A protein has these predicted regions:
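Glycine-rich phosphate-binding loops that contact phosphosugars or nucleotide phosphates
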Residues: 61-234
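Short, solvent-exposed amphipathic alpha-helical segments in soluble enzyme
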Residues: 91-94, 122-124, 148-149, 183-185, ...
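C-terminal helical/tail subdomains of lipid-metabolizing enzymes
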Residues: 358-396
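A generic structural motif
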Residues: 135-140, 196, 212-216, 266-267, ...
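Flexible loop/turn segments at secondary-structure boundaries
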Residues: 82-85, 114-117, 139-142, 175-179, ...
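Acidic catalytic cores of enzymes that act on phosphate-bearing nucleotides/polynucleotides
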Residues: 3-10, 40, 44-55, 59, ...
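Cofactor-/ligand-binding subdomain signature composed of acidic, glycine-rich
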Residues: 1-72, 380-392
Length: 396
């Protein structure tokens, strides 16, 4: 698998905008290459455990898969930090890729507000709803309370002998209050090692389990993220290095101080939200800040625009419109034509407004592409932060 088969990074509009000189870019690229070596050393020392996630064996779901087979909804109980990546992946899968309605719907219960719980219960049928509980320590009181709520509610709706078929617990510690609930109700469970950087939990095999139960192809996701990671450390992947070089050079030239993630259409919103959270988590040394497309921009903002370019789009039925000659040509034009035209219009509008623009053109959204996009952003963020850390040490 080549990165270019999944997505392409287009920096041409950044080059035309004069964000930085060739000399400044070359200096930034040299720093990025040095930062890559630093990251490799840290990874070899085990300091970046989430980078190993795509290469770990997938969690075996066979012992609960039969129970969850007929579920129409899967309720995920966990902390906001643990399930941020799952929210992003399920959001894009359910709103865009899983459109046939054949898979269970994933919902997330990470808010103690009673209104949130009862709103979910208003659409959840306990007979066809499974609950997956994610808790590393087994002692998180919000998670314990949510599970206790669910057990109380399900207990009144389902026969006691069938109750355990609707629950599965994922935890690291066997001597916890959560395990007392597991023993009391005889709930199925499995143990997983503690996960560092919970906001990168999408690279953790156990934390991908709820998506796997819903039909998400975890193997393809790991293939996309893992292959990209290998290409990066082997020096075959240039996209993160090029972007990091541009960012560092632009900031040094005082032309850049912020980065906005923006997806064309609402389908990319879950991805951009997750990317902002990851950047906030990993960005320890860089003054560079990330924000959403809802915040006002200034002239020193770089925008990353995501665009799916080769997806098959439906056409209108020309014969249906044959009695309206003025619309005949419009009806015969593939939707993809208008999507591309809108993309070009957005790009030109950004450039004319004096904003810096990078485009990431996705070939087609699927599990493999998502894995590559997620890993690319993580590596890019690590590079930028490491470059600023090195620069800080140079000054001192």
């Amino acid at each position: 698998m080549k990165n270019r088969d999944l997505f392409q990074q287009d920096l041409s509009l950044l080059v035309k905008s004069g964000l930085c000189s060739r000399k400044e870019y070359a200096s930034g690229y040299a720093r990025a290459v040095h930062a890559l070596r630093q990251i490799k050393i840290r990874a070899d020392r085990g300091e970046l455990p989430f980078l190993r996630g795509p290469f770990l064996p997938l969690t075996d779901l066979s012992f609960v898969q039969e129970n969850f087979k007929g579920m129409r909804m899967i309720l995920v109980v966990g902390s906001p930090e643990n399930i941020a990546g799952l929210r992003a992946l399920s959001g894009i899968m359910q709103s865009w890729i899983w459109v046939d309605g054949a898979r269970p719907r994933l919902c997330f219960l990470d808010d103690l507000d009673p209104e949130v719980f009862w709103e979910l219960m208003s659409i959840a049928n306990p007979m066809t709803t499974g609950v997956v509980v994610l808790s590393e320590s087994g002692e998180s009181e919000p998670i314990l309370l949510q599970l206790m709520r669910c057990l109380e509610y399900w207990h009144g709706m389902i026969d006691k002998e069938d109750l355990a078929k609707h629950f599965v617990v994922v935890t690291s510690h066997t001597s916890s209050r959560l395990m007392r609930l597991v023993d009391r109700w005889k709930l199925p469970w499995w143990k997983y090692p503690p996960v560092a950087f919970p906001q990168l939990g999408c690279f953790s095999p156990p934390l991908l389990a709820p998506l796997g139960l819903a039909g998400f192809d975890r193997g393809r996701f790991n293939m996309g993220s893992g292959t990209l990671c290998v290409q990066f450390f082997q020096g075959q992947l240039k996209a993160p290095l090029e972007m990091a070089a541009v960012v560092f050079a632009g900031h040094k030239a005082q032309a850049l101080d912020a980065h906005r993630m923006w997806g064309q259409g609402s389908i990319f919103h879950p991805i951009t939200s997750w990317m902002q959270q990851v950047s906030a988590r990993l960005n320890k040394h860089s003054p560079y800040r990330y924000f959403s497309n809802l915040e006002p921009m200034n002239s020193c903002t770089l925008t990353t625009l995501f665009f799916e370019r080769h997806v098959a789009r439906e056409r209108l039925v020309p014969d249906f419109w044959k009695d309206v000659p003025a619309l005949k040509t419009l009806a015969q034009t593939p939707m993809l034509h208008w999507v591309k035209e809108e993309h070009e219009r957005l790009c030109q509008a950004q450039v004319k407004s004096g904003h810096f623009l990078r485009c990431i053109n996705v070939h087609s959204l699927n599990e493999e592409t998502l894995g590559a996009l997620f890993m690319n952003h993580v590596l890019e963020t690590l590079l930028i932060d490491t470059m600023y850390d090195d620069a800080h040490h140079d000054l001192h």
